Amino acid sequence: MKRNGETKRRRNVAEEAEQGEDPAMWENLDRNFRQVQSVLDRNRSLIQQVNDNHQSRMADNMSKNVALIQELNGNISKVVNMYSDLNTSFSSGFHGGKNGHDGGGAAGTRA
């Protein structure tokens, strides 16, 4: 199913390029959304581990939750920053016009 979505995105990038849009901007946004999704997927895994540890009621597992929750909190901060960077990149791409976008941007600097 992901492959079909990738194909559609690539086709949309090609169509936008034909219409004079900035395909580099869309590719950059797509790449950064995938980075955000990766962190969100990791958070889902962390939450499941925390739940499993909590349900086990074993002292060792409960103590592991401290580090897992700290990582989860750090990841939430990363996601907030990544979305902020995406917003800036997206706004710059549209307000600056296609000539004002350099294809890079701060959104690609965090992971």
Swiss-Prot record:
One of the record's GO cellular component terms: nucleus
Induction annotation: Follows a light-dependent circadian-regulated expression with a peak in the evening, about 12 hours after dawn. Induced in seedlings and roots by continuous far-red light (FRc) via the phyA signaling pathway and by continuous red light (Rc) via the phyB signaling pathway. This light-mediated induction is repressed by ELF3, CCA1 and LHY.
Record annotation: effect of changing S45L: In elf4-211; reduced homodimer stability associated with a slightly impaired circadian gene regulation
Subcellular location per the Swiss-Prot or TrEMBL entry: Nucleus
Keywords of this entry: Biological rhythms, Flowering, Nucleus, Phosphoprotein, Phytochrome signaling pathway
Gly residues bias locations: 94-111
Region (Disordered): 1-26, 90-111
Known outcome of mutating G74R: In elf4-213; reduced homodimer stability associated with a slightly impaired circadian gene regulation
Keyword Kinase carried by entry: no
A Pfam family recorded for this sequence: Elf4
Coiled coil: none
Similarity comment text for this entry: Belongs to the EARLY FLOWERING 4 family.
Protein's name according to its UniProt entry: Protein EARLY FLOWERING 4
